[in-house]
Amino acid sequence: MFSNIGFPGLILILVAVLILFGPKKLPEIGKALGETLKEFKKSTKELTDDAFQEKEKKEKM
């Protein structure tokens, strides 16, 4: 999805975010985005671990 944005595209997005939210809000937005990504990765890992454990249970039976 985002694989073809490239470096210039990222710079453009950062400038647009900076203009929209201002420099004071940028750290708060970055922190919230980081926490959201961390929680998403954690949930995804838990889901795949649960599915793997369920598969192993079925194979042992």
Curated annotation (Swiss-Prot):
One Pfam family, short name: TatA_B_E
Keyword Transport: yes
Parts of the chain that traverse the membrane: 1-21
GO molecular function annotations of the record: protein transmembrane transporter activity
GO CC, any one term: TAT protein transport complex
Keywords attached to this entry: Cell membrane, Membrane, Protein transport, Translocation, Transmembrane, Transmembrane helix, Transport
Keyword Transit peptide (UniProt): no
Primary residence: membrane
Membrane topology term: Single-pass membrane protein
Subunit structure and binding partners: Forms a complex with TatC.
HAMAP family with a match to the protein in the record: TatA_E
Descriptive protein name: Sec-independent protein translocase protein TatA
The organism of origin for this protein: Bacillus cereus (strain ATCC 14579 / DSM 31 / CCUG 7414 / JCM 2152 / NBRC 15305 / NCIMB 9373 / NCTC 2599 / NRRL B-3711)
